[in-house]
Structure formats: C-alpha cells, structure tokens
Amino acid sequence: MRCTLLILCTLFHFLTVSAQELTARVNINHQQVQGTDNAIFEELKEKLEEFLNAQQWTSLQFLEHERISCSFNITVKEYKREEGIWSCTCMVQANRPVYNSAYTTTIFQFQDNDFTFTYRQFENLNYNEEIIDNQLLALFAYYSYLIIGIDLDTFSLYGGSDVLNRCLNLTNNAQNSEFPGWKAYDSRKNRFAIINDYMEGAMEPFRTLQYNYYRKGLDEMANNVERGRTEISTAITENLEKAHKDRSTSMLPQIWTDYKKDEIANIYKGKGTAKEKSQVYDVLFSINPSQSNSWDLIKQ
C-alpha cells in the first residue's frame, strides 16, 4: 500500500512540475496568399507550437499552472514557395494571472512588422542556443526569452535579468543577419531597440515599474483595492515618468501604455482621489497623447 502511494505521489509530482516555461498558441493567417497548399501553414503552426512548448528555455522549474500564456498571431503577407521565404507580421502577446483573482493581465504586446524568415515544407526545426543559424528559430527564441524575462520581472525586482541577457546576446549575435528587425539603430521600435532599451541602465526605472505595477499593485488589489491602486499610481508617476525622462528616445513607455491603456482607465474610472487621477493622467498623456480617449476616462 505504501509502495503504491509513493508511486502515485511521484507520478503526481512529475505531472504537475514542468521544466517548460511557456504555454504558447500560434495562429497563421494566410488569406493574403493565394494558390498555396494550406497543409504547409498547418504544418508550420504545429511545429512552432511544439517547439515553443516543449523547449526548456531556462533551468527554472515551473508548475503547470505557472507556465506563461502567450500567443503569436502571424499574418503572411507574401510566401515565395521556391525560395521558401515568408514575409509576415506578427502580433506577440503574453499574459499573467493576477494574485487571488480570475483576472489575467497583459505583460507584453508588440506588433512585429519585420517578421521575415525562411521555411520549407517538412523542414526540421533543430535549436541550438550556441549557434542559432535559423532565422525562424531566432525569432521565436528572442520572444521566448523576452517574455520569460519580463514575466520574472513582474514577480521579483529585476528577476528576469539572466534570461533577458540571453535575449540581448542573441540579438547582438544577429547583427550581421540579412533579415530585417535585428540591426542596431535601424529603428527605435525593432527587436534590437526593445531589448537594448529594456536592459540599459537608464531604463532601470522601467523595470522597477514592472515589479511595482504588477506585484505590488495589481496583485495587492484583491486584498486591498486602495493600497493596490496607490502602488500603481506611484509606479506610473515615479517609475514610468522617470524612465521616459531619463531615456526620452526609448519607445518602451509608449509601447507599454498602448497595451495597458484600457486596464489603467478601468483602475481609475470613478475611483481614486482627484489629485491622484490628475497626476496619473498628466504622466500618461505626456508619454502617449495618441491614447487621449483612454486617459480622459481616468478623470471621470
């Protein structure tokens, strides 16, 4: 009886503890591509999901319910079958649960318009972190490291540093790539700019924001709404504002406010003091005036 119980407990442990960090979904929209066998799109989707979800990206142990939910919505703009070249865009999103609630919050969202790679039907996807000579795998390794690092940052201050440095190293090693999106200073909003800015010393307040907003703010709201909102206000008016001022050329604060706008508006609409709402509004409007409709809701 004891032997049976021990075996069951051991099996339960291996079923619930996972080395893998991600629960990823891949969607491939190929409506703009005509005259191509749909089988290759379904094949690529399945291979990418298997790659993302089976790969062990770090040495950390994640419980099954701790795996990071993320999605990659790829739109194929052009597919050159003979050369195996895919010209795409990709909307990348990652979420995390909020403590003691059924609510999930977005921790990263980005539209990558330079999502170009090569892939031929039946091609094997063999990943080697030391030598990433496959553009398709480089793209998904980049976002996997970035998502895991950001997620860890939201649970402990600078907690994602190790894995984020791996993301930065991958990007630095891709500087000679013929594919777009990797080059330093080609764009303020490409893959290089995102990870380089995120890891720059002047942007430490932005990483502090990640911890204060999510862990000290949102996670606290289930226990004490007022205290949680106060922490969020401090994160925005101190951390986010300082990051924007110290590194005014970085697009990270704007990208962050683009995908947090609805959540932030709901946190303050009809709640909080007039002074608190005014201070938060001023910071957000100065960073991203294009989202003024959302910021106006804060003052209600």
Where are these regions (language model features)?
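Bacterial Sec-dependent N-terminal signal peptides
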Residues: 1-22
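Start-of-domain marker
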Residues: 20-87, 98-100
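Second-shell loop/turn segments in exported
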Residues: 31-38, 126-134, 246
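Sec-exported extracytoplasmic/periplasmic mature domains
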Residues: 49-57, 149-153, 265, 269
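Acidic/His-rich structured neighborhood in mature extracellular/periplasmic domains
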Residues: 82-193
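Flexible, glycine-rich surface segments
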Residues: 159-249, 253
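A cross-kingdom marker for long, charged
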Residues: 214-300
